[in-house]
């Protein structure tokens, strides 16, 4: 029996499902920031984790049957998404502690929404990282908090923004290492 089944369709399907779940989590976080409080039950994050495990299994099966550069790309892609999902879990936990409103919350909410809207395999995310850097700089230039409570809230916001930056930076780094070569190769096929 020389036929070796391909799991390419399953890999592509689960890739889309993972990106959809990540968008859903980011949009929920944006909503929590808009409202000023929120409780994340972690259900979507759990489904995301299951999808990442499913992807890992399909890539393993594909590697057993067809060891190609595409399989290496897939493996690294899902590892990057796994690292991002860990950051989403941290951010969700931190958001559960959030009870604040203010201009910064609206700005941060919009950044989470923008990140969700731009989340895609082929997006380099370099423009998004620049926007987050600008936002961090704007937060640094704001007047210092006057009370301990304001200080703690500002620190939470700043930490959340830094975690979002790390989330996006993982994609930027991945694309610089793997995406440029992979999408160039795919483009040459057409």
Feature annotation, model-predicted:
Residues 14, 21-37, 47, 72-190:
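Soluble C-terminal extramembrane regulatory/interaction domains of multi-pass membrane proteins
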Residues 2-74:
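Non-transmembrane accessory domains of multi-pass membrane transporters/channels
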